[in-house]
Amino acid sequence: SYPDDAAGFSNRGNVRLVVGDVKGSIDDQNKAISLNPSEIDPYINRGIAEEALGLWSQAKKDYMFVISLDSKNFSALYNLANVEGSTSHWDKARDLFSKASLYNPGFAMARSSLALADFQLGNIDEAEKELIKLIRRYPTFADARAALTALNWSNGEAGKAESNWIAVTELDPRYSDEEWLKKIRRWPPQPIKDLMNFIDLK
């Protein structure tokens, strides 16, 4: 037990989240925050647990609090972007993904998410450029390859779509699962639709 250790409570909360005890995780983050209200990590960790329960407004509040203390906190910016996306505010999500990738240029998932938000918003050229750059730098990054598959297909480039998809199926088969894309990875609806159309050859 960690009667007075904020970090201990926060770490135990993270473990609880991993094993599926989301409410227990939130309880531990609450204890960590009450012991050390100025420590940032428990707010981010609590936000992640709140997201797991679909408590978007609570998660948003936690991430906004972190950003108010540390405007360049790329984890909070990225997570807040995911919340905005989950509530269909893709323009806000795009700007936040952009900030997260600006403050941590090596954060490949933030850059891929930025491209996906651009894809959703109809900024197809920007999305394609970003995805191609990402794949050049990280050839085994499945998210960017899957996104480019969907984008190629929507542009009528079947050959390019096929070659990107071959790599995806070897790297991460979850990308063919529509529910996983919606609920876990949380892609925007248009890229999901285009990827599913590709898979079904529509």
Language-model features: where?
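Terminal, low-structured helical/coil segments at or just beyond the last alpha-helical repeat
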Residues: 162-202
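TPR/TPR-like (Sel1-like) alpha-helical repeat modules
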Residues: 132, 136, 140-142, 146-176
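Conserved alpha-helical positions within TPR/SEL1-like repeat arrays
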Residues: 7-18, 27-30, 40-52, 74-85, ...
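Structural marker of alpha-solenoid helical repeat scaffolds
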Residues: 1-2, 35, 69, 102-103, ...
